[in-house]
Amino acid sequence: MPKRSDIKKIMVIGSGPIIIGQAAEFDYAGTQACLALKEEGYSVVLVNSNPATIMTDKEIADKVYIEPITLEFVTRILRKERPDALLPTLGGQTGLNMAMELSKAGILDELGVELLGTKLSAIDQAEDRDLFKQLMEELEQPIPESEIVNTVEEAVAFATEIGYPVIVRPAFTLGGTGGGMCANEEELREIAENGLKLSPVTQCLIERSIAGFKEIEYEVMRDAEDNALVVCNMENFDPVGIHTGDSIVFAPTQTLSDIENQMLRDASLKIIRALKIEGGCNVQLALDPHSFKYYVIEVNPRVSRSSALASKATGYPIAKLAAKIAVGLTLDEMINPVTGTTYAMFEPALDYVVAKIPRFPFDKFEHGERRLGTQMKATGEVMAIGRNIEESLLKACRSLEIGVYHNEMSELAEVTDDALVEKVVKAQDDRLFYISEAIRRGYTIEELSELTKIDIFFLDKLLHIFELEQELAAHVGDVDVLKEAKRNGFSDRKIADLWNQTANQVRATRLENNIVPVYKMVDTCAAEFESSTPYFYSTYEWENESIKSDKESVIVLGSGPIRIGQGVEFDYATVHSVKAIQAAGYEAIIMNSNPETVSTDFSVSDKLYFEPLTFEDVMNVIELEQPKGVVVQFGGQTAINLAEPLSKAGVKILGTQVADLDRAEDRDLFEQALKDLDIPQPPGQTATNEEEAVEAARKIGFPVLVRPSYVLGGRAMEIVENEDDLRSYMRTAVKASPDHPVLVDSYIIGRECEVDAISDGKDVLIPGIMEHIERAGVHSGDSMAVYPPQTLSKKIQETIADYTKRLAIGLNCIGMMNIQFVIKDETVYVIEVNPRASRTVPFLSKVTDIPMAQVATNLILGKSLAEQGYKDGLYPESNHVHVKAPVFSFTKLAQVDSLLGPEMKSTGEVMGTDVTLEKALYKAFEASYLHLPTFGNVIFTIHDDTKEEALDLARRFDAIGYGIYATEGTAKFLNEHGVHATLVNKLGENDDNDIPALVRTGKAQAIINTVGNKRTYDEDGAAIRSSAIEAGIPLFTALDTADAMVRVLESRSFTTEAI
């Protein structure tokens, strides 16, 4: 069926900010879809609130709106643009829920907009637990016994009837939000109450637990002519009971017999046909390991995290083809762009094994609840490809960047047997390492399979890895054993440990004996047909399929898995850098390990190596490709950390040189550079042990900001008030960086701002200054940023521009750099310099219209700013106001305190743009799901340090007609100063009148809660904050953010005055 000619303009809804459960995979899907629709000649309108995406670049769609994805704003855009159709299936749960809302509000009918891809009835059938159950019964597909409930009592009654354990699944939520496994009534009451609250339709499904079954996923495609195929099947290493986004996953399935595979494949195809889905769909099934019994767990009628993984695992571009199916093309008339010869109807076949391991944020959240269950907690993931399970698993382990280079964590050697068994049984994010440790201690794989319900086949592979370790230790220097270990994915570093050598010695032995990897192509057809994709993985075999081209090449290092502090912003910069390298006439080669992102789409670069970002793996590619040089500026700290070892090995680092990178990162050198350039900085010192730190702090004076050098996202950073706190910090946190000392700085409370600059060594272009709304003390990644600055005088802006230029030239920066300033009493201090692209690059590129990463890449390749048409100095300001606001994923992370400080906690960002600051702020708050009605009540619970300041806020809330509740000390203070505040208890003293009760009953619309600089962990405060997070009401832990919210409310409210 040819494509439809009755529709001309199509609107695509993006997935908004990155949160746990909905990450960069939707930028990849959305980008592919928009380009595919444009390729077919349609006019594309895109709405997405997240500026850090490639998808929101001007050239991806014909019109791009970076606006909140809310009914109010999307309706406005629909009325203005009048598209013929809407494609919501590429925007994750956000896109689907938005389509449902638009339909229910009658907007789609009013404007005659047709839904493409998946009909509303199918979305409803897949998402609404009751309808899904009915459909499965009609198709005679088995599902676990279950009951839909709307109250906690109904849940308890059903669970009593079928017996525990049971699983709670809220309707229409994302990544298992609010759900969980309950072993008894007490757990059920707690989880069901929370789940009903979080479900937009107050509905949960209570179902019999089938934990322990194998979890299998099928990624399926169907078109309007009812052609359907399985793109990829995948098997979870972890059994049912752990969210698939938090599971280690292998593709293709490893332990199924042919009969089982056919049975589940037939079920998946039957379901997608019954739902009449046009496009991609993901079916999750549970298989009883002891019989042919299976259950259908759930169906996602949209492109998902698993589809991104399936696309990268097979090379089959699901989102691109799904978009084309949505406009009427069929699978048997589209060519598979990978082979260029076979049709899209042809099911991919794999002659390799893919392993995916999730990346968790617990390195940032020490207090977080690490137990895994049906609610997702991972922020990102890595993927690795090998010729066997051992190889792909070990490559994935060293891609994680959690300080391991094998399936082993050295600190687990200290764990007692009892603690070890508990961690093996009760899965946490690091269970793989505990199981591997148990095998090293002699636990049998039969025992472990019994304890974990993980298939013995996988445990046998871990046993094989251990046997190879013993083999290596027994045969030091043996070349045959070395070959065998390399074929099974061992890193040089691990072999070096076992041989008591250095990794470089092992590497030398390898090279002498010509034990080097070959690179195999990912071609979707197991080498059956000719294929031309430049997409490779390494393995230790014979035939190399990656041929070095005659063109001079440049390698760009990506940023690895998405984690807090290093998000999709760096992928954005990587992709732009590649575009510039290609435009300059070089061959652009990307190395990266993240399956979710645009940079690992093989059509982006000339060659893609899907490999871990470690010195060994990068060096192997460099030795084959012999590039002109390597670009490390755009891959975040991951790539910067590789600059020194690569440079020592004789690799040319393009852009700012390693010695200069060091001057920005090494404290003493940096202080000296600032002194030489005559630029003020907060007084500080370095310390290598506890006594030195205390000595330094006495000299500088408390409060001080302490942190290790060389970290990203403010890891292990704290503001300390006194000597005791400092001593405890030195004892607990300093492990963060043993070779690098700890920095002790005077903590200056002032206005903070930051600058991204691009320098060619002579001229320095400053696209703009971003002013932070929160004062110093809140990590820049968690602050709201405003461009252009609203409160900085011309003189201060000139000073900032002058210091920026001095620093860029003084540090011999070629390419990009990011500088953070704090301003107190009209003095501008430099807090830190990052000699690389930072997380604000996409935002600033969008608001100034300067493709910053491309400009910087051209400089790195030798083309000056003047040659590119840019002048030295501060770029003229935009006439709109733009606000970048952080978005957090606290609802997914139990026991993580939502108090903001110098350690970064946000997972994503949104942008609000308008003609005034108030309007831009309103949009930013709406886009980040912080909705405040124009009247209501606000709760104040304020630390003594900030009461004076909170008084002004309370007066303003009072003036616009808000009711004020306050805890004891705060209420007394406010009432004494003429603001009427109603007393409320902190916690539990009287249950009807404590803060959680007010929040529960909907009497409070926001909470403002500050703590002093002392920031010790306070349980009451944490409980108050989490009650706001659970209820989804705005929580402000910085008065500056609350002040911004009041400005918005003031601009939208009316005054009532007597005449």
Swiss-Prot record:
Region annotation Carbamoyl phosphate synthetic domain: where it falls in the sequence: 547-929
Residues noted as binding Mn(2+) 2 in the record, renumbered to the chain: E298, N300
ATP-grasp domain sequence ranges: 133-327, 671-861
Coiled-coil blocks: none
Region (Allosteric domain), start-end ranges: 930-1059
Entry binding sites for Mg(2+) 3: Q820, E832
Keyword Glycoprotein: no
SUPFAM superfamilies: Carbamoyl phosphate synthetase, large subunit connection domain (SSF48108), Glutathione synthetase ATP-binding domain-like (SSF56059), Methylglyoxal synthase-like (SSF52335), PreATP-grasp domain (SSF52440)
Entry's Gene Ontology cellular component terms: cytoplasm
Amino acids binding ATP 2: R707, S746, I748, E752, G777, V778, H779, S780, Q820, E832
Residues at which Mg(2+) 1 binds: Q284, E298
Amino acids binding Mn(2+) 4: E832, N834
Any single biological process term in GO: L-arginine biosynthetic process
Reaction(s) the record says it catalyses: hydrogencarbonate + L-glutamine + 2 ATP + H2O = carbamoyl phosphate + L-glutamate + 2 ADP + phosphate + 2 H(+)
Name this protein carries in UniProt: Carbamoyl phosphate synthase large chain
